[in-house]
Amino acid sequence: MDPFLQDHWGDVHTSLTTYARNQLRPQMPADLRVRVEEYVGLEIEQDEEEEVLSRQKPDVLVTENWSSAEQTAIAVSEAAVADEPLVVTTPRESETLRRVLIQDRRGDRLVTAIEFLSPGNKYGEALIHFRKKQRELLLGGVNLVEIDLIRGGGWAVFPPDAAIPGSHADPYRVVVVRALRSERFECYPAGIRQRLPRIRVPLRPGDRDAVLDLQLLVDQAWEDGGYSDIDYARGPLPKFEANDVEWIRERLAQQGIARIL
């Protein structure tokens, strides 16, 4: 896994969802279909490091009149009356997120939801909202496949942080939860130094699991996105652990890139 792809996650995320759909479609029974769905996620206030992980968007300004009732909360001297201001607010930003859905053609029943997490899923209220949606999907009988290839942010995949061994949680997390066995979490190791796993994608009871090769998806996104021009001399955020920095230097030196970080 190339951790520098995180700096270009908007483009990479779009590619991963599309390629995942394409990889899964030939494995579907005739009465199931695979679709990419767009939805709007919240962007919240973040500290400097977290802000780097989020996409920049144009500001949208909304104006409103300030009512006299709202002004009563402010003490005004009898000798001086302030001019009434024009109040300008900036709403919470939103970003378009995507996920892969497997549906039963008969009645459009949702069978499995596959999510490649984005920075916008992993902070503050957006994280709380994401976890709420997870619970709703499971209660509705939907299988969950959650793939977190983002370094930094809160624990967003379904099982509690403490339930996942460190070998399967750092720095990336891949978890499958079957709706009929929601107390069980199928966890796959996913690190910087190893090949990303081939994971089982559950369908309906009685259907054979599909297989999703995550490394093939990332390789294709890297190739098709033309990311050979990444500036490896500039370390991404969040910073790497010292032992990872040394390993990355060695790998890039083998490819003729002499200096990074």
Outline where the language-model segments fall:
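Gly/Pro/Ser/Thr-rich low-complexity, intrinsically disordered segments predominantly at protein N-termini
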Residues: 1-261
